[in-house]
Regions:
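Active-site signature of alpha/beta-hydrolase-fold catalytic machinery across serine-
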Residues: 130-134
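Gly/Ala-rich beta-loop-alpha elbow adjacent to hydrolase catalytic centers
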Residues: 120-124, 128
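Short beta-strand immediately N-terminal to the catalytic nucleophile in serine-hydrolase-like folds
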Residues: 118-120, 146
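Short, surface-exposed "cap/lid" segments of acyl-processing enzymes
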Residues: 27-74, 78-79
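Structural motif
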Residues: 31-33, 115-117, 142
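The alpha/beta-hydrolase serine catalytic core
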Residues: 8, 19, 89-93, 139-182
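Alpha/beta-hydrolase active-site loop
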Residues: 85-111
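N-terminal cap/lid segment of alpha/beta-hydrolase-fold proteins
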Residues: 3-29
Length: 182
């Protein structure tokens, strides 16, 4: 069992999607925090290893925040204002991860955290690196990659001999503004 200070949170992404999550705090005040970014179709509450990480980090004097991003589950709904919108890894546009991570970074900075570690798990690793590359914020001191993945290689392995046909088909759909048919 893990006993530590926890707070359920709801933070709106830069474009207004409500992102629920949890903040774990150490016993003593700190300016250090780890922002955990879940992987493809993940969420903040089912990756049990995050409980262990939260205990380890808080014991070392770090806070940890983990949250649902718009890539949560395969297909799901999240709130945007007063209505639900369909999101999930099936609809996620990778570049929009900036909108989710940015609001979390801004929220923790507003709470007094100025020593930030971005931590990604699986597909979340790609998002952490992408965010840092695009924003290059001085408050981000570290990046932790947990089980990083190579999406193109995984697709190639999964599709086998059909890989090139899949790439060409996807490229044509995008060129013809038919991304939803992917």
């Amino acid at each position: 069992e893990f006993f530590m200070r926890q707070e359920l949170i709801r933070i709106n992404s830069t474009d207004g999607i409500e992102l629920p999550g949890i903040l774990y705090m150490p016993d003593n005040n700190t300016n250090k925090i780890v922002i955990h970014i879940h992987g493809l179709s993940g969420n903040f509450y089912e990756n049990r290893f995050v409980d262990t990480l939260a205990k380890t980090y808080t014991d070392k004097g770090y806070a940890l925040i983990t949250f649902n991003n718009r890539g949560k589950d395969y297909i799901t709904e999240m709130l945007k204002g007063d209505h639900a919108i369909v999101v999930g890894s099936c609809y996620e546009l990778f570049e929009e991860c900036i909108l989710d991570i940015e609001c979390i970074v801004n929220w923790v900075k507003d709470k007094g955290f100025n020593d930030i570690t971005l931590q990604g798990h699986s597909y979340g690793c790609n998002k952490a690196i992408y965010y840092y590359d695009k924003k290059k914020e001085d408050c981000i001191k570290n990046i932790v990659l947990l089980a990083p993945c190579d999406i193109p290689k995984e697709i190639e392995i999964y599709t086998g001999d059909e890989y090139q046909n899949c790439i060409e088909s996807a490229t044509n759909l995008v060129k013809n503004n038919k991304e939803d048919e992917l």
